[in-house]
Amino acid sequence: KRQWENDEWSERISFDDVLERVEPDGTAPFDIKYADMKLGNKCDLACLMCNPGDSSKWIPDYNKLMKSDIDQETKNILEWRKEEGRLNWYRHDSVFWKDIQSKLDTMESFYIIGGEPTINSEFESFLEMCVKSGHSGRINLRFNTNGLTTPERHLELYKRFKNVLIHLSIDGIGSYHDLIRYPSTWQEL
C-alpha cells in the first residue's frame, strides 16, 4: 500500500511547481486536494494489533487489564490516553464539517480510516454530503474496512464517486484470521 501511495503522490505536484507558487512573503496559497480523516474508533472487532484508540470493541478488555495486578511499567506502556472527546471530536465540531464542505469543490481525494468506517454513521453522512455537493463525481475515495459490513446505501453512494478504492484488512486465513480478527470468523468473511 505504501508503494502505491508513493507512486500516486509523486505524480501530483513537483517541487518546482510548489516553488513557483510561493509568494515573496513566503506564503503559498494552495487549494486543499487531499485529506486523511479518522472518524473515531467505533469498530465491530477487537483485533490483536489494535487498541482502544483504534477499536471501541477493545475498551472493556482494556479496562479489565488495567485493573489487574500488573506492574506500573507495563501499565505505562499500555496506557491509553482517553481525553474526553479526543476520538469523537468531529461529531460536535460543526466548523470542521462546514470547512470540509466548503473545500469539496477543490478536493480530489479522501482517505478514511476508523475504527470501522462502514458502521460509523458519520461516514455515511460524509458520503451523502459529498454527493449532495455535486462534486463527488470528481473525488477519489479510499478507506480501510474489515469487510464484515457493506450497507446497501453505501453501495449506492459509492457509484457517485469518481473512484472508490477499498482496502480490505485480512491478516490471515482460517483459524489465523479467527485469532487475529476476533470475534470475526473466516467463514463469516
Where are these regions (language model features)?
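Local cysteine-cluster metal-coordination motifs and their immediate loop/turn environment
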Residues: 1-2, 42-52
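A general structural signal for short secondary-structure junctions and capping/turn motifs
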Residues: 27-28, 101-103
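Core AdoMet radical
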Residues: 32-42, 53-94, 105-121, 133-151, ...
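Conserved alpha-helix/loop element of class I SAM-dependent methyltransferases that forms part
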Residues: 96-100
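Flexible, acidic/Gly-rich N-terminal and inter-domain linker regions that tether
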Residues: 1-33, 53
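A conserved mid-protein helix/loop that constitutes part of the nucleotide-sugar donor-binding site
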Residues: 124
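Generic structural signal for well-ordered alpha-helices
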Residues: 127, 155-158
